[in-house]
């Protein structure tokens, strides 16, 4: 029977530990350190018990809550409420106090999604026609794709999570567009490369890759292998990913907040283990073969996406978002 308890990050770790196989074409996935984020706080009963990927549910609920509670919206997703379902939407609306408690985390989730889609639009404008979403969860971009018919979207996820997503799409009345290709990959049986080849992914075409909420759970070596995945793709390919800076780079308030969150995920046996400083990371990326990088820090992200708001929605953490192009 399919294991429905597998988390989104643990699934990705299995995939990305073998990312160098994209270049070598022969290596299977390596044994990965178990790592997964603690699920974001969700209303009781939201999305139903026993469903796969609590982290995918948590991120989807935060995107949905943003549509309900935040104005103006940083990330406008007209399908965010539909895909989580009427029961989850009702639970969100019935508990606005919880939305205030999750405001900072919600800001992070919607900022990184908005930034990734802004970068995707820019990549499309310069000719990129493939979008690879690693650990797509309940992401709805493919179903509201403004470039439908021109941009092919490939969503990689565990088969259980993709089956659950397809059921959610059907239940919500959201059609699966022709430009969306699901790539269910069971890393106990196949590599990421073979899974993508089976569904028609073109490794010889420039590709935009999103990798959100993963890097901090990887060992440094696995993180580097993950980034090598993109350098093995066609020139012009690009990745957007988020990461955290080391403790020494944080102020007292930020450090205290991190320690509370870190203790929670460590107690679950899934610690954050890898941090990067922006300038050394940019140098590392150039050494791997990326031709250009662009780092968005929290100060710049707040200025770009959360300026002049009256509702208090803003980043308060230490997460940066990096964009790197081959």
What are the functions of these language-model segments?
Residues 1-7:
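N-terminal secretory signal peptides
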Residues 186-191:
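Conserved acidic residues
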Residues 192-203:
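Short amphipathic alpha-helix with an adjacent loop that forms part of the alpha/beta core around
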Residues 218-229:
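A short, conserved alpha-helix within the catalytic core of class I
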Residues 252-326:
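Rossmann-like AdoMet/SAM-dependent catalytic core
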